[in-house]
Amino acid sequence: MWLKPEEVLLKNALKLWVTEKSNDYFVLQRRRGYGEDSGGLTGLLVGTLDTVLDSTAKVAPFRILHQTPDSQVYWTIACGASLEEISQHWDWLQQNIVRTLSVFDSGEDITSFVQGKIRGLIAEEGTSAGDEEDPERFREAVLRFERLFGLPQREKLVTYFSCSYWRGRVPNQGWIYLSTNFLCFYSYMLGNEVKLVYPWDEVSRLERTSSVLLAESIRVRVRGEDHFFSMLLRLQQTYLIMQQLADYAIVRFFDKETFHAEHPLANPLHITQRALEIHARNQSFRSFFRLPQEENLCEVYESFLWVPFSHVNTLGKICVSENYLCFASQDGSQCHLIIPLWEVFSVELPDRSSRALTVCLRGKRALRFSEVRDFERLAATIRRKCGTLGSPQHCITNPDEEGVMVGQSQAVSTEALMNVFHPHDAENLDPKMLKERMKEQSWQIHFAEYGRGTGMFCTKKTRDLIVRGVPETLRGELWMLFSGAVHDMISHPGYYGRLLEDCMGSSSLACDEIERDLHRSLPEHPAFQSDTGISALRRVLTAYAHRNPKIGYCQAMNILTSVLLLYAKEEEAFWLLVAVCERMLPDYFNRRIIGALVDQAVFEELIREHLTQLTEHMTDLSFFSSVSLSWFLTLFISVLPIESAVNVVDCFFYDGIKAILQLGLAVLDYNMDNLLCCNDDAEAVTVLNRFFDSVTNKDSPLPATVQQASATANDKSIQKVDISDLIKEAYEKYGDIRTEEVENMRKRNKLYVIQTLEDTTKQNVLRVVAQDVKFSASQLDELYLLFKNHDPSLPYLDQYQLDQSQFSSLFNLLQPWTTHTHSRSLARSAFHLLDENGDGLVNFKEFICGLDILYNRSFTEKLKLLFKLHLQPDSAEDGVIRKCPERGRAKVDLQEYLKQWQEDLQRREENIKDLPRINQVQFISLTKTLYSVFHGDEEEESLYRAVARVTSLLLRMEEVGRKLQDSSPQKTPQTTPTSTSQPESSPTKPTSPESETPAESRSTHDQPESPVSQHETAPSHSDITPNSTSHPSTPTSSPTETSSPVLDTPTDTPSSPCTVRDGDWSFSFEQILASLLNEPSVVRFFERVVNTDTLITRARKNQLKDAH
């Protein structure tokens, strides 16, 4: 590899390098301790020094230096891992550079020319290290990474750090390498080499820890084993990168269906340290300000913002994206605001001395920022973006335009269902209504002071108002604002209407499920007892299923959406659902509910941290995880009365999942005494259900007909709990839980949850497969990992399946015989044979059952498998393999199912007499396969002779049979000789590889189908030898002769695949088996015990090399 020229004093390197070649301008050197003297003490010391100092010489012990006769300074220009590699660079220099250097007069000119040439060569290589901070050093690290770990060429190194890896109480100083798919570590200390390579998708725990021995370290759990890395200079940065890489690996490998192709990091080759940092920053920015997924953080400025309601300047950061100007305080005031750039009217620079700028908004509002370091650049950025976003398409400011939009969607409900079924009565002087008006007045005062809409200041006072309860009339507006759904709706005008038009009249599984659950959504509420509410709910759910078919429709979405429709317009409810499913509760609403399971694990962790008394009493907290599932999926709507649940939803839209976790802790804390008295889970469930029935909302203005009456509503002995008090207590006791902390816990537990699900799936699969094979449990476990890694992109809960190319690769890695010329065709035939349902995929059970025959079964079973591999498949004249009709995926009735089940049982008890006969082309292919399998064996010569004897014997037997048949009296067509007859049914779908002898196959198939010829000649022994290129003799026939009745057999009969022409010869499996049993060498070969563990170990080593 060419290197950027760097100075080196040769006199300081004489003790570590040995000169191999030299001329007037260049020196080729070898590192001491490598090559001839690598085994001595010098090799140990130099190797240790190279590892500790991160020297390139560890993996590139050869180098080329540039020198000039009049200078003592040398320049490194190339390095190599082997003498052959460095010699190529040396030869290139000799042929292209040395002759040219003689024309220069001074040494400086020579050095300048050489350096320029080397830099040009490096630029031509175009390596991916150009984006890194130190390209040359990163190029060297990439070289070490590739040489040390032998991973696929497409594997991309992201970053690397110096650290110590702890084995027991002994630290091993080395380097950790983080690539797109692997965590690697290498250390070499005084001859003790430590090398670790772990895929990210096998990491189940990743967290920062500290102990007495280790001040601070990173703990990585892989396959149940903990690994500790410490003494990292930038531990937090390293941990965040490792966390991101593990998360992306989980998403790519186990959740590919939700990993969008347009994702910025969908291509692993685009993942760099800088890309990871940018992506993490964008995610954090969007999550904090609840902005659409299209927004990316462009610029950040520190500044002071004048806050009019408190009359102070608050310190914070200005964040600018494509369409928004955001500010978040850093002084603990919890103040933040979001300004859409299309709302900006102008930008002024009133005071350059204080580096201030004023942003004027529509509606006669202004924001004054001061002490902005680069205020002129910020002003120019805002002006430029406002110029491109000045179009009114982003918001509706014209009342006429609004009327047009409403008129275009007459079918869409433009009123919240609560306003339709329970309109606000201004003359109602009920105490609850009076309190509701007081709440409205408090919010109006807040709006007047802090602003209203997207430009509102959000502060501690805003949260206080949320905790006390949101007025019914403002609930929809505030949900849209705090969830960020308002930004999505403004950015996509008319999107919901177009979705409804696109999905109108469509039918799908999601639509069927939606129809089934429509009448189960708040059935006690009048809005969903009429067509108005049911139709609106159907439209919103159907539109979302059409927008996001990867999620489609999941249970609990109907309950949540019905509550949204009560307080928001139909289009607003749609965008609220989008915000919940895609941003606020990611991975919740799919068939695996991974997001809910992750939050269950987070909840369990918080219980251990905050409710220690409960954890001491109940060591197994899985009960609370299972009970809380409905809490998270429905935001407590399914367990609380609707009038109380909406207060919880208020807090959720403001604080996210943090509010739900806090409330869950408060519920358990409130019932602590009763839970400690429970003896089993059933009692605990009863305690919690009774508590939820006692929760009320004394301030709710909803009429009694709407409120859900609990079973204990009239029970005076049960103490009532007001939802506002419960929420207030949750914020007071557990409000210190930060959103950032919850997100980190989510990431940490996501690895554990997915690996737990994967392990459960694996155990279930292995339990089923183990009943039919003779592999040990550990061997099955290793084979499962090999099988899984050949298709890591499938969702983890799906049964792993391989297509033909993947199967062939894995089959060739695991077959017990040495690689031979027929490996590819044999693997192809095995794939079609094992694909019992004809779907073009082989699952783990099918694969293991086939492998079990090759590894653990008797000589007869192995030979039978080889025999079946060489039978012709069910194929049409075009050569396309087609599935048998009975193996289709169509629905069948009970009788048909029982018939198929009986046939499967019969297939398991398959008798060798039921196997079809093998014709001449297939037999020749089988013989050649045997020759290839025997190649390289210690008894190769005797095995070859045995096959030749068996072939000759079978041919003589067939010839004698033909002669006896010819000399017998003429028979009717119904008594055609048995050589062309087939059994009535074939229990196994026969398959065959492509012919390895195209000339033979072509000449055979080109013949016209003919009856038995009286002049047929049997092939000679030379026709079947492994080196033979000729094909067996075939009969000649007259076109006027009539065909045999065998050829008139319908093509859909089971015997048709192996029907042969009457002029060809064929053998039964019994004949071949009987002949080979007389050859001890062949029997010994197939009865030889297979070292399964060795083959699996070899396959694991070679799998990565063949992965790409």
From Swiss-Prot:
Cytoplasm in keyword set: yes
GO biological process: glomerular filtration; vesicle-mediated transport
Pfam family, one: GRAM
Annotated site (Arginine finger): 516
Signal sequence residues: none
Keywords recorded for this protein, A-Z: Calcium, Cytoplasm, GTPase activation, Metal-binding, Repeat
GRAM domain boundaries: 143-210, 283-351
The keyword Transcription regulation is annotated on this UniProt entry: no
SMART domains: GRAM (SM00568), TBC (SM00164)
Ranges of Low complexity composition bias in the record: 967-998, 1025-1057
InterPro entries for the chain: EF-hand-dom_pair (IPR011992), EF_Hand_1_Ca_BS (IPR018247), EF_hand_dom (IPR002048), GRAM (IPR004182), PH-like_dom_sf (IPR011993), Rab-GAP-TBC_dom (IPR000195), Rab-GAP_TBC_sf (IPR035969), TBC1D8B_PH-GRAM1 (IPR036012)
Highest taxon listed in the record's lineage: Eukaryota
Region Disordered, annotated ranges: 961-1059
One Gene Ontology term of the molecular function aspect: calcium ion binding
Polar residues: bias regions: 1010-1024
EF-hand domain location: 822-857
Start and end residues of each Rab-GAP TBC domain: 469-656
Free-text disruption phenotype from the record: Morpholino knockdown of the protein causes pericardial edema, retracted glomerulus in an enlarged Bowman's capsule and glomerular permeability defects.
A GO CC term attached to the entry: cytosol
Positions that bind Ca(2+): 835, 837, 839, 846
Classification via PANTHER family: PROTEIN VASCULAR ASSOCIATED DEATH 1, CHLOROPLASTIC, TBC1 DOMAIN FAMILY MEMBER 8B
Domain topic, free-text comment: The arginine and glutamine fingers are critical for the GTPase-activating mechanism, they pull out Rab's 'switch 2' glutamine and insert in Rab's active site.
Function: Involved in vesicular recycling, probably as a GTPase-activating protein for Rab family protein(s).
Protein name: TBC1 domain family member 8B
Gene name per UniProt: tbc1d8b
